[in-house]
Amino acid sequence: MAVITIDGIKLDVPENKNVLDCALENGIYIPHLCHHKDLSPLGSCRMCVVEVEGQEGVTTSCTLKAKDGMVIKTKTAELERLRMLALELLLTGHPEDCSTCPKYGNCELQMLIQYIGPKTGRLKMRTKGFRPQEDNPLILHDMNR
């Protein structure tokens, strides 16, 4: 077992367990998108970035292994700035028609937008530019989605 501190809260956690799981299991929310309990952690969404005392820079909490004595911060101005930028970059390539999406109302991306609150409009949305194929009466093939 290892004793780690996340935002001033001491936790007894299994050594080498990823910090994101440790936090979530103890009621500490760290924003994340690409994490799934049945898959190996990637850190590709960059939402779960944290600062570790004694280490330079930031690291993704889903790939960070818990070590005894580790002190972790999840809420700093720099982390908020980095998360907002990562979310804005994700949204530049995301369709804006959420109300027609099957995940509408139960979408992790929408929840992150509400939690982080990006300043939309700073980055221009990339349009993919594909014309929907409507030659089949039953299937709409839209490569823009």
Model-derived features with residue positions:
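Short small-residue beta-strand/loop micro-motif enriched in glycine and branched aliphatics
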Residues: I4, P31, V71-I72
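Short polybasic/polar patches that bind polyanions
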Residues: T5, L24, Q114
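Fe-S ferredoxin-like electron-transfer domains
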Residues: R46, Q55-R145
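N-terminal cofactor/phosphate-binding cores enriched in small/glycine residues
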Residues: L11-D68, L82
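Eukaryote-biased recognition of intrinsically disordered, low-complexity regulatory segments
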Residues: M1-I9
